[in-house]
Amino acid sequence: MQIDIQSRDVFYVSDGTAITCETLGHVVLGQFPFEANEKTFPFVESEDKLSDLLKEIEISYRATGHEPLVFFSIVIPEIKLKLLDAPAHCYDVLESIVQKVQDDTKMAPKPKLQRSRSVNKDSDKYFDRIAAIEYTLAHDDGITLKGLEEADIILLGVSRSGKTPTSLYMAMQFGLRVANYPFIHDDIARLRLLPEFEIYRHKLFGLTIDAERLTEIRENRLAGSEYASDSQCLYELQTVEGLFRREAIPYINTSSLSVEEISTRILERTGLRRRLL
């Protein structure tokens, strides 16, 4: 008997990166025969962020007639309580999930081994990941500015501001093609936006860092050099941040953030969607 595959809206919500919610949610939803329309809401740690989330839930409910499924990890009591009052089926990722999803969707779980699964689909994901990694490595640290039309995003920043690890993480975990370009000493003296970037302004995103942290990182690489001096680091950062503001390039400070947090915040700020789940 053919099963009628339904479509359900699914939200992943966290006051952190939401990566844990996504991971557990994907495992659980893989046991149910419906297509998931997924949205991720990381860093829901303020009333403003919560308000935006609740509006999205309300829109989903009114548009589909079904309460969306919300996988969440929230430690702030006030936000958690308000989320639980929303017109949605909410699952704390630390609770038992599968049985509750079964109850709410009125569907019996179907383990992956009992469902048809496309090997080609998994192969496609594998090759997409490899292609993203190869592109990112080929466009690391300004190696080449050719092929920028294929980039999903172009990261800019001073040397040692976190561009390379962030680029590789986004390629490996999200399947995104990321180019990055460092503003080196020669660039800083006459800093301007390169002509090659003009038609890709919508792809540009800046990374900056506290001067003290940058000095510490550079000292570990070239101790005692002008490159690592307090004055040089401060000068470079002030100049590059001025360019970001002047050219209206969005940017974030990476000083206290992990690579996972940097990558997730970039997705949040740009609206980019990950290609791999």
Curated annotation (Swiss-Prot):
Catalytic activity, reaction form: [pyruvate, water dikinase] + ADP = [pyruvate, water dikinase]-phosphate + AMP + H(+); [pyruvate, water dikinase]-phosphate + phosphate + H(+) = [pyruvate, water dikinase] + diphosphate
Write out the entry's keywords from A to Z. Kinase, Nucleotide-binding, Serine/threonine-protein kinase, Transferase
EC main class here is transferase
Q: What are its E.C. numbers?
A: 2.7.11.33, 2.7.4.28
Q: What top-level branch of life does the organism fall under?
A: Bacteria
User: In which residues is ADP bound?
Assistant: G157, V158, S159, R160, S161, G162, K163, T164
Per UniProt, what is one GO molecular function of this protein? ADP binding
Function of the molecule: Bifunctional serine/threonine kinase and phosphorylase involved in the regulation of the phosphoenolpyruvate synthase (PEPS) by catalyzing its phosphorylation/dephosphorylation.
Homology family: Belongs to the pyruvate, phosphate/water dikinase regulatory protein family. PSRP subfamily.
Q: Please give the PANTHER family that the UniProt record associates with this protein.
A: PYRUVATE, PHOSPHATE DIKINASE REGULATORY PROTEIN 1, CHLOROPLASTIC (PTHR31756:SF3)
NCBIfam families under this entry? Answer: PRK05339.1 (NF003742)
The record's HAMAP family line, in alphabetical order, gives: PSRP
What's the protein here called?
Putative phosphoenolpyruvate synthase regulatory protein
Organism in which the protein naturally occurs? Vibrio atlanticus (strain LGP32) (Vibrio splendidus (strain Mel32))
